[in-house]
Amino acid sequence: MRILVANDDGYLAPGLAALVEACRGLGELDVVAPEQNSSGTSNALTLQRPLSVWTAANGYRYLNGTPSDCVHVALTGLLPQRPDLVVSGINNGANMGDDTLYSGTVAAAMEGYLFGIPSIAFSLSEKGWTHLDTAARVARRLIEQVIALPPVPGAWLLNVNIPDRPYEDLRGLRTTRLGRRHASEPVIRQSNPRGEPIYWIGAAGDAREAGAGTDFHAVAQGHVSVTPLQVDLTDHTCLPAWGSWLERAGEGGR
């Protein structure tokens, strides 16, 4: 068993060290992570400049790119062997609902999935690493289970969110669907030293769809949320309606 460990908070983040330790003894480990915090970079790849890779004193490799860059470079030339599993995290804060579209943590795992490798993204529900030990224990337990009993044939992608509470207070694992958030808060406008306007992206919106069965609901109730993800963004339920509309629009536009 060979495991690739990545993240989006950077190679110095406590969450990465905790996930690496959670994987100790489960196989050969390779760690490839961003040089700097790259939260919110989604699935971006760096195409406008070359990437450099360095090795830290603890053996972690890090590069001046995005989380997706890290996994992509690892899988397409950096590593001597293809990993059997890709794990990403442990993120400093939740990646639930719409967060998954922006998350570098999820993106790193998704990059592994795109290459046909089972992959898991781990996130602690609140910022600050208060119960990082809880998240690490959950990660260890889940990784052990998927190694011992693969859930489905072939590649798969899981998004795991762990409540920020003592391990003894967890209420178990739940399979969930993604919830939804309200739109983000307005941008924060400030001025630079020249008096020119600058903008900071506003905070994420509150949960909008957080009913039973969603990741938001599970975590709020003290459950570890386990959400299977896929890459296909097609709205299959709307395909017939759009097909009919295009036929009508085409006839009307002649």
From Swiss-Prot:
**In which residues is a divalent metal cation bound?**
D8, D9, S39, N91
| Pfam families assigned | SurE
| InterPro entries found in the cross-reference section | SurE, SurE-like_Pase/nucleotidase, SurE-like_sf
User: What is the enzyme's main class?
Assistant: hydrolase
Phylogenetic classification of the source organism: Bacteria, Pseudomonadati, Pseudomonadota, Betaproteobacteria, Burkholderiales
Q: Which SUPFAM superfamilies match?
A: SurE-like (SSF64167)
Q: Protein name, please? A: 5'-nucleotidase SurE
PANTHER family in the record, alphabetically? 5'-NUCLEOTIDASE SURE, 5'_3'-NUCLEOTIDASE SURE
Per its record, the protein catalyses:
a ribonucleoside 5'-phosphate + H2O = a ribonucleoside + phosphate
Q: Which family does it belong to?
A: Belongs to the SurE nucleotidase family.
What is the role of the protein in this entry? Nucleotidase that shows phosphatase activity on nucleoside 5'-monophosphates.
**Domain of life of the native organism:** Bacteria
- Species name for this entry? Methylibium petroleiphilum (strain ATCC BAA-1232 / LMG 22953 / PM1)
GO MF, any single term = metal ion binding
